[in-house]
A protein has these predicted regions:
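ABC ATPase nucleotide-binding domain helical subdomain, centered on the C-loop/LSGGQ "ABC signature"
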Residues: 1, 9, 16, 34-75, ...
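ABC-fold ATPase nucleotide-binding domain signature/coupling loops
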Residues: 1-6, 59-88, 103-106, 110-113, ...
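ABC nucleotide-binding domain signature
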Residues: 13, 19-24, 132
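C-terminal portion of ABC ATPase nucleotide-binding domains
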Residues: 55, 63-68, 120, 127, ...
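Short alpha-helix in the ABC ATPase nucleotide-binding domain helical subdomain
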Residues: 90-91, 135
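A short, proline-enriched helix->beta-strand linker immediately N-terminal to the Walker B motif
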Residues: 95-99, 128
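Conserved D-loop/post-Walker B switch-helix segment of ABC ATPase nucleotide-binding domains
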Residues: 111-121
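Conserved catalytic loops of ABC-family nucleotide-binding domains
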Residues: 124-135
Length: 185
């Protein structure tokens, strides 16, 4: 259901209006940061853009640019880092005010601290938006209501973080290997 309505009863165009998606390989267009953000909502105010950029932790680097939100982005975002592109694309999706937000490995290019800050902001600021998060980093999923473990295109387990640690060997193995990799030497 989306907005309490069975998705099969939605007009496809109306359903598309309710969904925003941010991919790992995202797209920025030639134009200013403002122009790129307004693809999410052409009528967005400066205040709305600043709010979603705070949620996506894009404001941190935008403020360092001499032209701020009027900074020109090269085709494909070649003049910003991968993590900066991802954060701008998350902000753009948030401007749409979707009922469903799909994040497909969309914070893979940011550090774990920034990833955690973005997840916390999304949890706190848009609690009524359904978030579907596809990630390889277990820390990106730990607080989810439901985690689905996929293996070779098939569902291998469903549950919370704690349930899957107890019941799913694949999830447990990935979690443990990532924990070992994050221990300071």
């Amino acid at each position: 259901k989306v907005g309490g309505v069975d998705v099969r009863q939605y007009d496809v165009e109306k359903l598309r209006e309710e969904v925003a998606m941010v991919l790992q390989k995202n797209v920025l267009f030639s134009g200013t940061i403002k122009e790129n953000l307004r693809w999410g909502d052409p009528n967005a105010t400066d205040e709305e853009m600043q709010r979603v950029c705070r949620l996506a932790h894009a404001d941190e680097f935008i403020q360092t640019f001499p032209d701020g939100y009027d900074t020109y982005i090269e085709q494909g975002g070649s003049n910003v880092s991968g993590g900066q592109k991802q954060r701008l694309c998350i902000a753009r999706a948030l401007l749409k005010k979707p009922k469903i937000l799909i994040l497909d490995d969309s914070t893979s290019a940011v550090d774990t601290h920034t990833d955690a800050c973005i997840r916390q902001a999304l949890r706190d600021e848009i609690p009524d938006t359904t978030k579907i998060i596809i990630a390889q980093r277990v820390t990106s999923l730990m607080d989810a209501d439901k985690i689905i473990v996929m293996d070779e295109g098939r569902v291998d387990g469903v549950g919370t973080h704690e349930e899957l640690l107890q019941s799913n060997a694949i999830y447990r193995e990935v979690y443990e290997s990532q924990q070992k990799g994050s221990v300071p030497q």
